Each structure stands twice: as C-alpha cells, then as structure tokens.
C-alpha cells in the first residue's frame, strides 16, 4: 500500500493555477477554504441560490459552472453523485481544454460510465475520509484528515503529482494519503454504506427495537438500549478498534458479544453481503439508482417517508428533548 505524506507532495504545483470547486456543500466549502488558506487561487462554480450566496459571503469569486471551468486549470466536482452527470454535460464538458485536470472526491460517475472525459484531460480523485466540517476544523487546528488518491487518466504525465498537490492544499498529506483506484474506492464505499454503515446498522437497530417492544418492553427503554447507546460503542471502536471497545465495556457485555454476535450476523448474512458486493461490482445497484433518479425517485421517496414514520423515530424525537447536550438540527440537510 502506497501512502503519501507532506514530503511527497508539492502544493507549489498549484501556484499560478486556478482551481474551480464545483459545488459548495459540505466538501465544497471545506476544500475550497483549505485550498485558499494554502495559498491556492480558488473560484466556486454554482448556480444561483443558497450555496451561491454562502460562497460569496465566504469571500470567494462565484460564477456559473461553465465560466468556472473556462477560468480554471483544475476542476474539482463536488456535487452529489446523482447531479454530476447532468452538470458535467450542461456546463463542464464543452469547456474542458487540453491539459486541464478533472478531479472527483468519489468515483461513482467515472467508474460507472456516467461521465466520460475527453482523452486530453487528466482525471483523478482526492477523497478525504471525513465529512466536510471535520476536514475544515482539523485543518484549522494544524492537522489533516486521511484521504485516498487515484488517477484514472494521465494525459499530461503529471496527474498524480497535481492530485497530491491538491491533497496537500486541502491538508490531507498531514495525515496520509493512500493510493487506490476509482474502482476500489467506488465499490468499497458503496458496499460499506449498504451493508454496514447505513443499511446494516439501521436494519439492526430497528430489528432490536422491534424485538424488545414486541416483547412487551417500553419503547423508550428499547430506544436507549438499541440506538442511543450505539454512539458510546462506535466512539470506542473509532478511537481504538474492536479491542479498545471490548476493553472498555463490562465483562458481561464482552462475553455476550462473543457468544451472541455470530448468532445475529450469521454465515447466511455474510453470503448475502457477498451477493450485495457482486451486484455493486456488476453495476446493478448503480443502474437501479440512476433509473430511480430518472423516474423522479418514487421508491426512494416512499421508503424515506415510511422510515421517518417508524415508532423508533417518534420515540427518539421525544427522548432527545431530554438531552440538553445534543444540538439537534432544526432543519435536516445533507452533510
């Protein structure tokens, strides 16, 4: 595994160039501000609206996507996956010039062929492994978050060097930048989200909550045991792995972990995980998600509404009112 650090990257490669950050959401605002603080010339390309005004207030030169691409030598696409192909076709593609670099922080659209850049531009990825607010905060503290770097197309012969310069400008080489491929990043990212981080965890939490409430236990107690305390466990794992978590919990809990975990996540569960991975590798999930967006998201919206109306969510909202230390969002926004 090749990992790059500060000594391996030269942010001076970006000096005299302009970086266009397309999109000004979680990653967009963080990467743009970190680059600017590293002495890089940055413009923001977004359509008129809330993000346009926020970027302007933050002191950036804000312009249309088309103008930003024409202005820049490096173009970083930081829009949601489902928006990128449309924006690329509408404002990026016709304005690309020989020798430019097209950057991504997730490989979905390149790997699954939704964006097909011309052969005369570099195509690379710099993917910080943290949400935008943490990318920014840790940078301001003088540190950085780890990231992945990949080169899909090296038209100039300098794609990796420029990508590493970008990673250094964002602060990621302070922690370490691991070399990967668009395929590996995309497929593992989707797999992790679907089977563990999002799909797996939410299904497990709901199943535990429902088992307790169906067994006659109060929903408030079920919420505490199956959702609320999950943060305590995940934080311990995040800080020091499974061993640290098991060292920190009671011996009773640890023994229960050993003798019960494999009864819940069974060999059949792992077989299903492998089937999910195959679907991702063969592009079945990508096709399903692309078609879902083209159809106006009927399944997505119906499932989202059903999940929001689950008893777990209603009980949780009431209990969180008791927790003064939680800064509950007044408005739900994508991070």
Swiss-Prot record:
<keyword id="KW-0479">Metal-binding</keyword>
<feature type="binding site">
    <location>
        <position position="193"/>
    </location>
    <ligand>
        <name>Mg(2+) 1</name>
    </ligand>
</feature>
<keyword id="KW-0100">Branched-chain amino acid biosynthesis</keyword>
<keyword id="KW-0028">Amino-acid biosynthesis</keyword>
<keyword id="KW-0521">NADP</keyword>
<dbReference type="InterPro" id="IPR013023">
    <property type="entry name" value="KARI"/>
</dbReference>
<feature type="binding site">
    <location>
        <begin position="81"/>
        <end position="84"/>
    </location>
    <ligand>
        <name>NADP(+)</name>
    </ligand>
</feature>
<feature type="binding site">
    <location>
        <position position="47"/>
    </location>
    <ligand>
        <name>NADP(+)</name>
    </ligand>
</feature>
<comment type="pathway">
    <text>Amino-acid biosynthesis; L-isoleucine biosynthesis; L-isoleucine from 2-oxobutanoate: step 2/4.</text>
</comment>
<feature type="binding site">
    <location>
        <position position="189"/>
    </location>
    <ligand>
        <name>Mg(2+) 2</name>
    </ligand>
</feature>
<dbReference type="GO" id="GO:0005829">
    <property type="term" value="C:cytosol"/>
</dbReference>
<dbReference type="InterPro" id="IPR036291">
    <property type="entry name" value="NAD(P)-bd_dom_sf"/>
</dbReference>
<dbReference type="Pfam" id="PF01450">
    <property type="entry name" value="KARI_C"/>
</dbReference>
<feature type="binding site">
    <location>
        <position position="51"/>
    </location>
    <ligand>
        <name>NADP(+)</name>
    </ligand>
</feature>
<feature type="binding site">
    <location>
        <position position="225"/>
    </location>
    <ligand>
        <name>Mg(2+) 2</name>
    </ligand>
</feature>
<dbReference type="GO" id="GO:0004455">
    <property type="term" value="F:ketol-acid reductoisomerase activity"/>
</dbReference>
<dbReference type="GO" id="GO:0009099">
    <property type="term" value="P:L-valine biosynthetic process"/>
</dbReference>
<feature type="binding site">
    <location>
        <position position="132"/>
    </location>
    <ligand>
        <name>NADP(+)</name>
    </ligand>
</feature>
<feature type="active site">
    <location>
        <position position="106"/>
    </location>
</feature>
<dbReference type="GO" id="GO:0000287">
    <property type="term" value="F:magnesium ion binding"/>
</dbReference>
<protein>
    <recommendedName>
        <fullName>Ketol-acid reductoisomerase (NADP(+)) 2</fullName>
        <ecNumber>1.1.1.86</ecNumber>
    </recommendedName>
</protein>
<dbReference type="GO" id="GO:0009097">
    <property type="term" value="P:isoleucine biosynthetic process"/>
</dbReference>
<dbReference type="InterPro" id="IPR014359">
    <property type="entry name" value="KARI_prok"/>
</dbReference>
<dbReference type="InterPro" id="IPR013116">
    <property type="entry name" value="KARI_N"/>
</dbReference>
<dbReference type="Pfam" id="PF07991">
    <property type="entry name" value="KARI_N"/>
</dbReference>
<comment type="function">
    <text>Involved in the biosynthesis of branched-chain amino acids (BCAA). Catalyzes an alkyl-migration followed by a ketol-acid reduction of (S)-2-acetolactate (S2AL) to yield (R)-2,3-dihydroxy-isovalerate. In the isomerase reaction, S2AL is rearranged via a Mg-dependent methyl migration to produce 3-hydroxy-3-methyl-2-ketobutyrate (HMKB). In the reductase reaction, this 2-ketoacid undergoes a metal-dependent reduction by NADPH to yield (R)-2,3-dihydroxy-isovalerate.</text>
</comment>
<keyword id="KW-0560">Oxidoreductase</keyword>
<dbReference type="InterPro" id="IPR008927">
    <property type="entry name" value="6-PGluconate_DH-like_C_sf"/>
</dbReference>
<feature type="binding site">
    <location>
        <position position="229"/>
    </location>
    <ligand>
        <name>Mg(2+) 2</name>
    </ligand>
</feature>
<feature type="domain" description="KARI N-terminal Rossmann">
    <location>
        <begin position="1"/>
        <end position="180"/>
    </location>
</feature>
<feature type="binding site">
    <location>
        <begin position="24"/>
        <end position="27"/>
    </location>
    <ligand>
        <name>NADP(+)</name>
    </ligand>
</feature>
<comment type="pathway">
    <text>Amino-acid biosynthesis; L-valine biosynthesis; L-valine from pyruvate: step 2/4.</text>
</comment>
<dbReference type="InterPro" id="IPR000506">
    <property type="entry name" value="KARI_C"/>
</dbReference>
<feature type="binding site">
    <location>
        <position position="189"/>
    </location>
    <ligand>
        <name>Mg(2+) 1</name>
    </ligand>
</feature>
<keyword id="KW-0460">Magnesium</keyword>
<comment type="similarity">
    <text>Belongs to the ketol-acid reductoisomerase family.</text>
</comment>
<dbReference type="GO" id="GO:0050661">
    <property type="term" value="F:NADP binding"/>
</dbReference>
<feature type="binding site">
    <location>
        <position position="250"/>
    </location>
    <ligand>
        <name>substrate</name>
    </ligand>
</feature>
<feature type="domain" description="KARI C-terminal knotted">
    <location>
        <begin position="181"/>
        <end position="326"/>
    </location>
</feature>
